[in-house]
């Protein structure tokens, strides 16, 4: 009897111990589950926060490098960066540096990324990256993976509302333009030469606008007349750049131009869906004006000049072909053909023109070659904490050779100091893509 009672007591104790252990195990499991859930929640929270900081980190790095008008935004479809290269003399180099930074620290995870490049706060091109997943992993992004196009997608409407860092507005640039002119009109001398150093103040007060005030300082003048011996103003202009839907770009410039002209000039370019092809148009209403020192003499009568044509860009060789019908300053009307090949540090090509004067008489054919070269230094610009004007040589300089020595017909003007064949091609998508791939 005693043994039976003792056995029952032992069994009860064992059952109580098992119940205690089960309760302890359940409590321990619940505690561990709570801890794991909390850790997972914190990890997800910090991951989202880290993802948001990634775009901001890339923006801050670009600002430190000297890029202006920098910002970013993101939605469910893609992440978008906006930037303007004010740090490097060449757009291709600057855009390539920006791509490297964004690839390193600013790409979203498993989502497309777009970079919209501005010029004077006006969107020019976009670079688009689409990540490719292979075997449950994402390949490392490289420069060759970015598509370059005039197309901004649907991102610009959202990106234009973003508050940009390091604004380019109200910042003063002083660019010194070395200007060389040559002519061969006499037998006993090979060339007459004119060499000027022409500093220009450039500043923007609102989006797309640029004010240019240039002073021409003669260094050497042999054969170009007494007026060129005097210090006098050069370009005094206000320009407004704009972009319309369907890849239409334009620029309106008013003021005092070169070649002794003043007035207004409008340029409009349209790029087809096949971006190798484009339509080009230009309209000018100008009069004669010249400076004697700082006194301006002008004729109030105005004349119309115009140009309309098309262009084709050969991406394999970075070569631009254009054919245009034009009316020049002496009211002669004709056609002009140009072929320009663009390299990283220069652009060079030739041109040919044939026309008739205002009375219908044939004007002799003229042509020649032209080139534009990048000026040193080839590195970065520097702005001293935005307190002082940034002083540099102009990005490039060029010459036009008149093979038939035509002095009267086929004359034209340059509306803005920075207008040249190299600058006009600086945002060409095919050229930017070649810069990304080759350098």
Q: Can you describe what each PLM-predicted range is?
A:
Residues 219-228, 260, 280-313, 324-336, ...:
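Outer-membrane beta-barrel translocator/channel fold
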Residues 178, 197-203, 238-242, 266-270, ...:
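Residues on the lipid-exposed face of transmembrane beta-strands in outer-membrane beta-barrel proteins
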Residues 35-47:
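Bacterial N-terminal signal peptides
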């Amino acid at each position: 009897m005693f043994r039976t009672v003792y056995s029952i007591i032992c069994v009860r104790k064992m059952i109580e111990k098992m119940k205690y252990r089960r309760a302890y195990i359940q409590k321990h499991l619940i505690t561990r589950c709570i801890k794991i859930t909390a850790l997972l929640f914190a990890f997800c929270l910090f991951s989202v926060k880290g993802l948001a900081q990634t775009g901001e980190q890339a923006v801050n790095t670009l600002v430190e490098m000297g890029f202006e008008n920098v910002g970013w935004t993101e939605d469910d479809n893609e992440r978008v960066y906006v930037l303007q290269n004010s740090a490097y003399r060449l757009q291709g180099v600057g855009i390539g540096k920006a791509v490297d930074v964004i690839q390193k620290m600013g790409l979203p995870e498993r989502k497309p990324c777009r970079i919209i490049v501005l010029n004077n706060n006006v969107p020019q091109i976009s670079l688009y990256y689409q990540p490719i997943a292979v075997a449950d992993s994402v390949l490392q992004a490289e420069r060759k993976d970015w598509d370059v196009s005039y197309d901004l997608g649907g991102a610009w409407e959202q990106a234009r509302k973003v508050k940009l860092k390091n604004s380019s507005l109200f910042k003063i640039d002083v660019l010194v333009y070395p200007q060389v002119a040559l002519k061969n009109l006499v037998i006993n001398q090979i060339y007459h030469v004119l060499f000027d150093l022409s500093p220009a103040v450039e500043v923007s007060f609102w989006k797309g606008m640029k004010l240019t005030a240039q002073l021409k300082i003669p260094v050497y003048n042999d054969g170009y007349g007494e007026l060129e011996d005097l210090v006098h103003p050069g370009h005094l202009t206000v320009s407004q750049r704009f972009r319309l839907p369907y890849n239409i770009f334009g620029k309106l410039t008013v003021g005092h131009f070169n070649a002794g002209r003043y007035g207004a000039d409008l340029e409009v370019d349209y790029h087809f869906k096949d971006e190798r092809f484009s339509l080009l148009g230009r309209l000018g209403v100008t009069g004669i004006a010249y400076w004697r020192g700082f006194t301006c003499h002008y004729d109030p009568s105005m004349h119309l000049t115009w140009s309309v044509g098309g262009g084709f860009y050969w991406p394999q060789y970075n070569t631009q072909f254009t054919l245009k019908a034009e009316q020049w300053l002496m009211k002669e009307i004709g056609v002009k053909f140009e072929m320009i090949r663009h390299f990283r540090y220069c652009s060079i090509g030739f041109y040919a023109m044939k026309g008739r004067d205002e009375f219908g008489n044939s004007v002799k054919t003229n042509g020649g070659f032209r080139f534009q070269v990048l000026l040193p230094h080839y590195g970065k610009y520097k702005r001293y904490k935005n307190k002082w004007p940034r002083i540099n040589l102009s990005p490039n300089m060029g010459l036009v050779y008149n093979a038939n020595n035509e002095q009267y017909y086929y004359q034209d003007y340059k509306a803005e100091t920075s207008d040249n064949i190299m600058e006009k091609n600086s945002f060409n998508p095919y050229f930017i893509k070649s810069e990304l791939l080759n350098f």
